[in-house]
Every structure is written in C-alpha cells, then in structure tokens.
Amino acid sequence: DALRINPSTNAATFNTIKKVNKRTFTEEEASAQVYDTFYFLTPERSANMLEKFVSSYTKKGVNNLALAGISNSLYSYSYKGNYYTRYDVADTYSSQIDSVSEETNLLLEQPFAYLWDYTDAFLDMPLGSSDYMYIDEEVPFLSIVLKGVLPMYSDYVNFEANKTEFFLQMVESGV
C-alpha cells in the first residue's frame, strides 16, 4: 500500500502526514463506535426514563414513537445484592411498553415475540440469514409469519451496496 504505513514497525517517524496540531494522521476503522463504553440501565431506570420521554412527546402532540434497545435486549443482572433474571427484565419491559402503547402508536426495532402484541410496526426486519456454513437455502421465515399481521420495515436501503438485489429481497419477503 503506497498510502498507509504500519506504525508498529517504528518506521513512522518521518514521511507521514501530520495534522495541524502536529499529531500523526491515523486512519480509524469505519465501523468504530462513537463512544467506547456504554452502560446498561436497570429496567426500572429505563422504565422511568421512558415514561418521561413519552410524556414529553405526547404533550407536544407526537403520538407515533419508535423505540430501540429495550425491544430486543434481555439480560440478567445483580443489583444491590439481588439477582434478576431475564424473565424479570422481560416483565418490567412488557409492563412499561404496554402502558406506552396505550398512549401512542409504537414502532419497535426488532422486537422479541413477547412484545409483538404491543407494537404497531416492526422496524429493521432481518432479510438475510445468519450465514452459518451449514445453511444451503435462505427462507425469510419471520417475515412470512408476520406478513399481514404487522407492518414490517427493513433496514436502511441507502447503506446497501447492491440496492437492486436488496429491493428484490424486500419484495420477496413482503417487507
């Protein structure tokens, strides 16, 4: 590569591009996250923040909300000496999402099955498979099951390399 040099070879002390602040210009991975660390909130804290979020938007007349994170994440945890299972987390999330769905039209990002009763639309419907080696054919099972039951929406199309093929996948799966 005529553009990049491996800094671990200690040959990067000269002939390298420098920024205005005299630091060596480095290439960062395009898939890197904006923040290095995220912390998970307890389900009770998530419910509290969600309640404030929903009330602030419904006061302004916004009745359609999209939620991500709590719709497709379950985890067990310990807090102040108590152990909570994924079932406990699911109960907390489902009761909170139930109350939110009574006030708003709720769009959930890849919701788990226990939340399908509360959602008005399924966002980011997976169109591909897991790409495991032992799979020889792909069947869009989830979209077949939910077709006509829930409105489904795919991932963002503008991030796809082959938009025509992706569009045909959406048509094929009914998304």
Task: Place the predicted regions along the sequence by residue.
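Active-site-proximal substrate-binding groove within the catalytic cores of carbohydrate-active enzymes
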Residues: 3-63, 71-175
